[in-house]
Amino acid sequence: QSWQQRACSRARRWSGRIRQLPPRTRRPGFVATRVAPLRIRSLHELPADALLREQLSGQVHFHDTHQLRLDTRQLRSDSLQGLMCDLLQAFVDQPPGGVSGLMRLRNLMVKPLGLRTSHLGCPVSSLLDPSAAQRFAGRFPVLAQRSDADGQHVQIVLGADDKHLRFRSSVALRRVGTHEIELTMATRVSCRNGFGRVYMACIHHAHHHYVVPTMLRAAVGRVMQSDPVTSQAWPARPA
């Protein structure tokens, strides 16, 4: 045999031995499952009972809505209030690098104009506002909030007013099945002047197709489990 044949034969033997080894990433006591990729869809209209509909009563120049469903068996908390807290904390603690890069570029461009700046993506930038009159769960600054009496639907509204526009964003969680929660993130913008309209025309495509979906994937990835656990293993936070 030539040295090439001997090398190939040895490689095949080692490959066979490696494939026979038990997976080391599985933990005893758990059934291995594959987490399905997040499927985010864009809606043309806000849900009929959206709290965001009560915001910006004047003309709305730009809006978008994104929605996805989560499997509660892959979440640390199966209470809607606990999940909302986890998502909002993830928005603050782990903003996606690509979105942060875009925000740094934006800040450099608009700071000389006296506009608001933030290292967080615009939809959630008001989570850093220390002067907010309301706080969700006593922790997170919000403009408005609503929780159904039966605990099946929780909504919060974020946002701010600037020289060129006013924006409002909402995060909503609705229980839609035994093991499913619907997450909806929506934004409405009312422009105050011509510059606001030009500004939104420039950023709307990136906001709709990249910023919001990327923020949602990053936040949901933070609150999901690498291994599914029973709800008893991660007790829900008290409402």
Specify the residue positions occupied by each region the protein language model found.
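Hydrophobic-ligand binding "helix-grip"
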Residues: 131-178
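Glycine-rich, low-complexity intrinsically disordered segments
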Residues: 213-214
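A short acidic/glycine-rich loop-to-helix N-cap element
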Residues: 189-210
